[in-house]
């Protein structure tokens, strides 16, 4: 099938991982990786954030969610086209440019996408909107009271 074709194309230095890995196993791969390649385009794409949470730089196609989650030149690199040549150029740049990607800096950036931050920001947003709504109701009720007093 297609998996066999891809394995043959990839050669002996590439290992394909099947499904069913535990979170710990996946994190172990992220921790040992030199970089995480993300050549796809997704609206968000959680795997680049997961890799960064392990301090691993991400080499990603520069469209979709990767543009928001990967800081080009700081937490990884973005490439412009979904072509083998563009990906290869990105890998070459990563290998040869000599830029350090401090794992702590990468991990810190990944925290900006944490579940806790999402919960905190959603709660703050809802609290603000509720307060705005209450002010609008008060303004309406004052307006109605003033109108009734005039009649």
How should these model regions be labeled?
Residues 3-20:
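Nucleotide-activated donor-binding/catalytic signature segment of Leloir-type glycosyltransferases, i.e.
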Residues 24-26, 64-69:
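Short glycine/proline-enriched, acidic/aromatic patches that form the donor-sugar handling elements
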Residues 28-33, 122:
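Short alpha-helical donor nucleotide-sugar binding micro-motif in glycosyltransferases
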Residues 31-43, 56:
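Acidic donor-binding loop of glycosyltransferase active sites
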Residues 45-49, 66:
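Short glycine/serine-rich donor-binding loops of glycosyltransferases
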Residues 57-61, 70:
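Short hydrophobic beta-strand element within catalytic cores of glycosyltransferases
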Residues 100-138:
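A charged, aromatic-enriched C-terminal amphipathic alpha-helix characteristic of glycosyltransferases
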